[in-house]
Design a protein with these regions (language model features):
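AMP-binding/adenylate-forming catalytic core of the ANL superfamily
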Residues: 11, 19-22, 113, 129, ...
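Adenylate-forming AMP-binding core of the ANL superfamily, especially NRPS adenylation
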Residues: 52, 85, 92-138, 163
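Active-site glycine-centered loops adjacent to acidic/histidine catalytic or metal-binding residues
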Residues: 50, 74, 98, 157, ...
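Structural motif
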Residues: 14, 33, 65, 105, ...
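Hydrophobic beta-strand positions
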Residues: 109, 256-257
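Active-site phosphate/pyrophosphate- and oxyanion-stabilizing loops and adjacent acidic/basic residues
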Residues: 27, 59, 95, 141, ...
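Gly/Ser/Thr-rich phosphate-binding loop
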Residues: 8, 13-21, 30-92, 102, ...
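Short hydrophobic/charged patches on amphipathic alpha-helices used for structural packing
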Residues: 5-8, 27, 35-37, 144, ...
């Protein structure tokens, strides 16, 4: 099981040069209250993948670590091949997961009818690569749902291109749809992370009789800090559209629940919000 303290010990003991995991793991190293006790000067790169890294975290990692942050995008079904972003370009485009990895990978943005969208238009990310899986084991129906006849794989992610840089908006299934408006959890989380007292933030949709869904946020603060729901809402005013500001904010004394990979456990959080 992931433990930031154990990670710091191992980095010091083994003179580790590269740490790659989901962005919450590198953030827990950065924000660890006893980080200065450990010699982690051997680190050269703090990689990330599997989830978005807020732009504010990229900035803080660059300021506080000699190691350069980097991030990639890919899926198990593509053998993790997709895009890479690191070095100075990552600092210039911190909300992007980077450029397509040449010459192995092609990435396109499509609508629901497999039509290619223009630069800047949001649609589903599809990937074609020799690294793509052949199919899901003994599940031809599921395989047929994600591949077209030309070998393009549907990722289940929404994104867009800004020049050569791919931006992931959200998982299709994780979008909050409030009164017909699609709200990116990643965008709202990134805005909350700009607050200096926030350690963790996770956005989910909760049922609403009138609007279908409302935006809700689970927040874990730095030790000794107290904030109210109104504090978070006021902080976000002007940073994101009013309809994207969380209707409900709950504060957790302990770190937010996560699955084995280190990603936030959104089903568990939805259950917590629905039961209280």
């Amino acid at each position: 099981k992931w433990d930031a303290t154990e990670a710091l010990k191992l980095i010091e003991q083994e003179k580790i040069t590269n740490v790659t995991g989901v962005p919450t793991q590198s953030w827990e190293i950065l924000s660890h209250p006893e980080r200065e006790k450990y010699d982690i000067s051997s680190l050269e790169d703090l990689g990330g993948g599997g989830a978005a890294r807020p732009a504010e975290h990229v900035k803080q990692m660059d300021e506080q670590f000699e190691a350069r942050p980097s991030i990639g995008y890919g899926l198990s079904e593509t053998n993790a091949l997709g895009t890479l972003n690191g070095g100075d370009e990552y600092l210039q485009y911190p909300s992007s997961c980077g450029r397509v990895v040449p010459p192995l990978t092609d990435i396109n943005i499509i609508d629901e009818n497999w039509n290619t969208l223009k630069e800047g238009e949001v649609g589903e990310v599809v990937i074609k690569s020799p690294g793509n899986m052949v199919g899901y084991w003994k599940n031809p129906e599921a395989t047929a749902e994600v591949f077209n006849d030309d070998g393009w794989f549907k990722s289940g992610d929404l994104g867009y291109f800004d020049g050569p840089f791919l931006h992931i908006v959200d998982r299709v299934k994780d979008l909050v749809i409030r009164g017909g408006e699609n709200i990116s959890c990643i965008e709202v989380e990134a805005a909350i992370y700009e607050h200096s007292d926030v350690l963790e933030a996770c956005i989910i949709g909760i049922p609403d009789e009138r609007l279908g869904e409302q935006v809700a946020s689970a927040v874990h603060l730095k030790a000794g800090v107290e904030l109210s729901q109104e504090d978070i809402q006021k902080f976000l005013a002007g940073k994101i559209a009013a309809f994207k500001i969380p209707f409900e904010v709950r504060f957790f004394k302990d770190p937010l629940p996560k699955i084995a990979s280190g990603k936030f456990d959104k089903p568990a959080l939805r259950e917590i919000f629905s039961n209280d």
